[in-house]
């Protein structure tokens, strides 16, 4: 009797799945064709209307890849512009039911089989599909059933996975993405306020201090008053923090002098670059906010010079801004920077100023979601590191003497009326 009930329930589950498939809940291939047609991705040839034609469907662990032939008259960029329409269309009701036969392979013929089926249904309610497009003569549409995580908390093991001048950036569906500053020396980071730009700068600095404490020299330019980099000010690795345009110019002039000296040394010794010379030291120049430095032409000229000549001499430039424009990021600078971490931006024009193409304006409104662009483009969820984690990592590298001087000055200031310093006269042998 129990076996008959259990068997009936199992058959019922399979019948339910079959009906859902007939309703089109799992038939993404036909959905994609309908979405494309409804979005205008079709051409007229005489009396016939042609749209994409499915040639191949390949199932993988991460989801399904569909290969389509594009009708003559349409380009890959036409489909790229409709990526959000495709993703939203595929998720129409997919949050409710999205079953496949293998989902039911885990069923066991036990008394609780109805509960097992219900658990499968409940889990499938949480699914949101994400897609990627590529083109190699055929339009490839990858439909991912497992999305990029919406939040990734920093763990020190992420830094331990990095070698040399690698730093953790974020996660894709496939795992951790790292950036190697010895492979791609310079980076642009851009994004709207509170989307994660400052956090990724702190993640990079903290990772480098932890892994390359003996070999890194940091020159920080923060034209928002120095607050972004305030907790790093007493690090042994920090050479200077510029908090206004005047200090920035002084720092950049000093850096240009160092750059000239190192290049002269390499020329004199016959070395091609700093790696051949066996010099492990790297000079990191981190600028936040680029738009505020743009009006100062000499500052801009030196930054462009560091981007152009700095790689061989061991200089690394990270250039960050909330307001990407062609004036804040001149083409001479962009041409020499091979890596971009771009968070959500308001306009396609802003995205083009950073990535040389649109896309950042279409990122979901998720804090930390970014496009990591090198020779290819990946959407990542950047790693979030909180201030307590930063302090724990950098604490061994703080200059104790400088910290004590700061704390003593703070106590003296707090002990004076109205928070002002008082004049103290001491009797000496000359008085």
Locate each region found by the language model:
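Short beta-strand/turn micro-motifs at beta-sheet edges
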Residues: 52-56, 175-177, 274
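Short proline/glycine-enriched turn/loop segments at secondary-structure junctions
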Residues: 129-130, 274-275, 359-363, 370-371
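Mid-core helix/loop region of P-loop NTP-binding domains shared across ATPases and GTPases
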Residues: 268-284
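N-terminal "pre-motor" subdomain/linker immediately upstream of P-loop NTPase catalytic cores
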Residues: 22-160
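Soluble periplasmic/extracytoplasmic beta-strand elements of cell-envelope proteins
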Residues: 140-142, 286, 371
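Active-site phosphate-binding and catalytic loops of NTP-dependent enzymes
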Residues: 95-98, 262-271
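P-loop NTPase catalytic phosphate-binding loop
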Residues: 1-24, 62-65, 71, 147-267, ...
